[in-house]
């Protein structure tokens, strides 16, 4: 039931006091011809409606949320308190810089810390999401070569295991995307060698990659990329696996985008809010978006980089998300962030060891923060697909993994438990997944018709994609 369907004429949740300001009639041209169709509800109606919706929802505050490549870690509530401090909450982006020195200091120190973590020389905090960061990075790549007069570089190389946003971001900027083949789950260096030429502008990589494997040839890849005059771009989706262990800048990457809403523990899902800062090495600093924050003595100021690509977001990005990430980094400290990565890798390997007893692991061995299992054998023997397994998992009150990604693994389940889950939770999740796989052999229809216990049963996803309904019509 929607809030509109709860509406009863004449009900009110709030009454305004009588105004002591003289009435003023707006000109007719500014008036609506009909009253707005707003719900008329009491305060209990509103509270109960949204409480009911919250009970039907699932979040990391309720349990494990092991979406691969999403890093759905628990978000400490201290971060929320910091973002809600009056000095941050009540400011306006048009205020004079002298009156928002605390906010500018936070942004300056945050980018300094992120540069230290990633091995970059400078960073913009403007992009509002990971894909937005990718787009910003690709705009920097394009502007860099345009500035050099090297306009023949029209290609971007992307592994076949890459996030779908990688080729999409490169294409949006006007680059031709060329796929690099994988070998044993990692970049095929020989295939890359064949593709590298004077037309290549950049190579986009995630390390660890989407299979949860560390690209062991990364230094060689960086050397080959730079020898042909191209730039090496780092998709920071999986940074949670390597903090304090190795830095993208030290691997040879020229550009990096981060996901503060993943690695640095700010709530995400359902479209945001996110933050996708972009860091660059020294030779690309002048191309960063504006405004940038700098420190001039004791004063923090805004400035425009010399060859800037322009604005990519209004004002300063998603500022409350920046506050939460800043709080998280200060709370954890260097040793704490390193421990985060250690525990993320440990949890993934522990869960993989449990799951490999009943599901295939195409690229087995030591993984990093996540791993990919395959239900291809289950599908072949029972007709039950990965989608059916994921839907049935919902009936047990936990969230399923990412499914059908990366595309190079048939019937894929991509699992990232993160560092914030304990052993008991991991054991329980493995137990649920094993039970569902066993049920696929004993009662496949139970999976094909799942979920059975959720407020919304299985939806027609094809119809929803082709004919989406985005708003309620009374």
Swiss-Prot record:
SUPFAM superfamilies: PLP-dependent transferases (SSF53383). Its EC number is 1.4.4.2. It is an enzyme of class 1 (oxidoreductase). InterPro entries: GcvPB, GDC-P_C, GDC-P_N, GDC_P, PyrdxlP-dep_Trfase, PyrdxlP-dep_Trfase_major, PyrdxlP-dep_Trfase_small. GO terms for biological process: glycine decarboxylation via glycine cleavage system. CDD domains: GDC-P. The modification N6-(pyridoxal phosphate)lysine is found at residue 262. It catalyses: N(6)-[(R)-lipoyl]-L-lysyl-[glycine-cleavage complex H protein] + glycine + H(+) = N(6)-[(R)-S(8)-aminomethyldihydrolipoyl]-L-lysyl-[glycine-cleavage complex H protein] + CO2. One of its GO terms (molecular function) is pyridoxal phosphate binding. Its cofactor is pyridoxal 5'-phosphate. Pfam families: GcvP2_C, GDC-P. GO terms for cellular component: cytosol; glycine cleavage complex. Keywords: Oxidoreductase, Pyridoxal phosphate. The glycine cleavage system is composed of four proteins: P, T, L and H. In this organism, the P 'protein' is a heterodimer of two subunits. Belongs to the GcvP family. C-terminal subunit subfamily. The glycine cleavage system catalyzes the degradation of glycine. The P protein binds the alpha-amino group of glycine through its pyridoxal phosphate cofactor; CO(2) is released and the remaining methylamine moiety is then transferred to the lipoamide cofactor of the H protein. This is Probable glycine dehydrogenase (decarboxylating) subunit 2. It comes from Thermotoga sp. (strain RQ2). The gene is gcvPB.
């Amino acid at each position: 039931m929607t809030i509109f369907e709860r509406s009863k004429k004449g009900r009110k949740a709030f009454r305004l006091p009588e105004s002591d300001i003289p009435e003023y009639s707006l000109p007719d041209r500014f008036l609506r011809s009909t009253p707005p169709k707003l719900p008329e509800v009491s305060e209990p109606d509103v509270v109960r409606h949204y409480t009911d919706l919250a009970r039907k929802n699932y979040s990391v505050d309720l349990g494990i949320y092991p979406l691969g490549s999403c890093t759905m870690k628990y978000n400490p509530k201290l971060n929320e308190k910091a973002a809600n401090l009056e000095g941050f909450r009540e400011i306006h982006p048009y205020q004079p810089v002298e009156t928002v020195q605390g906010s500018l200091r936070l942004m300056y120190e945050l980018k300094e810390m992120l540069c230290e973590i990633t091995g970059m020389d400078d960073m913009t905090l403007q992009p509002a999401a990971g894909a937005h960061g990718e787009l910003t990075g690709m705009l920097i790549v394009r502007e860099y070569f345009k500035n050099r007069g090297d306009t023949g570089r029209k290609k971007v190389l992307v592994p076949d295991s890459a996030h779908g946003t990688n080729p999409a971001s490169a294409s949006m900027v006007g680059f031709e995307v060329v796929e690099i083949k994988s070998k044993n789950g990692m970049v095929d260096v020989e295939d890359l060698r064949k593709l590298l030429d004077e037309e290549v502008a950049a190579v986009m990589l995630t390390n660890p990659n989407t299979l949860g494997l560390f690209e062991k040839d990364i230094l060689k890849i960086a050397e080959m990329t730079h020898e042909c005059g191209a730039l090496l771009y780092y998709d920071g989706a999986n940074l949670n696996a390597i903090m304090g262990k190795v830095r993208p800048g030290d691997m040879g990457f020229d550009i990096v985008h981060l996901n503060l809403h993943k690695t640095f523990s700010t709530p995400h899902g359902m479209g945001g809010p996110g933050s996708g800062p972009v860091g660059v090495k020294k030779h690309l600093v002048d191309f960063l978006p504006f405004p940038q924050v700098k420190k001039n003595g004791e004063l923090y100021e805004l400035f425009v980089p010399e060859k800037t690509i322009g604005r990519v977001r209004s004002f300063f990005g998603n500022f409350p998300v920046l506050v939460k990430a800043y709080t998280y980094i200060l709370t954890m400290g260097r040793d704490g962030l390193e421990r985060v990565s250690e525990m993320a890798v440990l949890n993934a390997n522990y869960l993989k060891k449990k799951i490999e007893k009943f599901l295939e692991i195409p690229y087995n061995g030591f993984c990093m923060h996540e791993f990919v299992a395959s239900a291809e054998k289950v599908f072949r023997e029972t007709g039950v697909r990965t989608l059916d397994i994921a839907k049935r998992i919902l009936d047990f009150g936990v969230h399923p993994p990412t499914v059908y990604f990366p595309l190079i693994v048939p019937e894929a389940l991509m699992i990232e438990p993160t560092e914030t889950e304990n052993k008991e939770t991991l054991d329980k999740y493995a137990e649920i997944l094993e039970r569902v796989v066993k049920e696929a052999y004993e009662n496949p229809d139970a999976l094909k018709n799942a979920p059975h216990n959720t407020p919304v049963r299985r939806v027609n996803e094809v119809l929803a994609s082709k004919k989406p309904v985005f708003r309620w019509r009374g």
